[in-house]
Amino acid sequence: MNDLKLDKVSKVLKEVRKSVPLVHCITNYVTINDCANILLSYGASPAMCEAYDEVFDFVKISSALYINIGTFTREQESSAILAAVSAKTHNIPVVLDPVACAAIPKKIQFIDKLFKVGRVDVIKGNIGEIKFLAGETSNVKGVDSLEDGEGALECSRILSEKYNCVVAATGKKDFIVQGKNSAIIENGTEMLTNITGAGCMLGALCAAACGAFEDKFMAVVGAILSINIASEEAYKEAKAPGSFRVKLIDCIYELSEEKLKKEGKIAWN
């Protein structure tokens, strides 16, 4: 059974490269270029469109919408709400990355509004952010989580049931939950924490996967497994942050279904 699931997860990569999903990103200025480049390497087509007068119509032609609230401006907030309304109207999957929501209360107000007027299919955050959204005390420092993973699965399940969506909590181990289904991924490298934007790039990949693959739970598992295995490959040749960041994008480009099936370390429940 586990081999069959891993086989399905590996097919996410195949579907992304076959369909070349158009991923509409409203994201932060720190990592916008990295998100665009890793989407291209994954096989998707990025569009970093955030103008208020354009987003409603642009979502119509997109395969998925990625909303990252890392450096949110007032215009971005207005554009993201309108884009989410369009996504709800036109049945476009939405991935939300609640960056620094545990540190800035106003971000919670935006998230609440997003669920009320728009749609969210996936919440992808670090463990600290996910625990905070689930109503638990979390240990964070700005945009970074200081959590060790304790309680992450339970909090992800609470949040998934509350919002009826896929929840991914990332850390040393990555926890993905949808209802009663869960997966824990143990691939990856600590070097991901030494570059800015690893989580943002992952969120973009999750959106691409959701835009290409009908099973959103498996799509998110596939996206996370992809960046984790790519990071392991990158670290074999790049031991410092600058070269690792570049090599990570290269390794996403070079990734194969066979590599995912061979190297994947996933515990299913």
Curated annotation (Swiss-Prot):
Signal peptide: none annotated. The keyword Kinase applies. Belongs to the Thz kinase family. Catalyzes the phosphorylation of the hydroxyl group of 4-methyl-5-beta-hydroxyethylthiazole (THZ). This is Hydroxyethylthiazole kinase. Its EC number is 2.7.1.50. It holds the Pfam family HK. It is an enzyme of class 2 (transferase). Substrate binds at residues 48, 197. ATP binds at residues 124, 170. CDD domains: THZ_kinase (cd01170). InterPro entries: Hyethyz_kinase, Ribokinase-like. NCBIfam families: PRK09355.1 (NF006830), thiM (TIGR00694). One of its GO terms (biological process) is thiamine biosynthetic process. GO terms for molecular function: ATP binding; hydroxyethylthiazole kinase activity; magnesium ion binding. Its cofactor is Mg(2+). Pathway: Cofactor biosynthesis; thiamine diphosphate biosynthesis; 4-methyl-5-(2-phosphoethyl)-thiazole from 5-(2-hydroxyethyl)-4-methylthiazole: step 1/1. It catalyses: 5-(2-hydroxyethyl)-4-methylthiazole + ATP = 4-methyl-5-(2-phosphooxyethyl)-thiazole + ADP + H(+). Keywords: ATP-binding, Kinase, Magnesium, Metal-binding, Nucleotide-binding, Thiamine biosynthesis, Transferase.
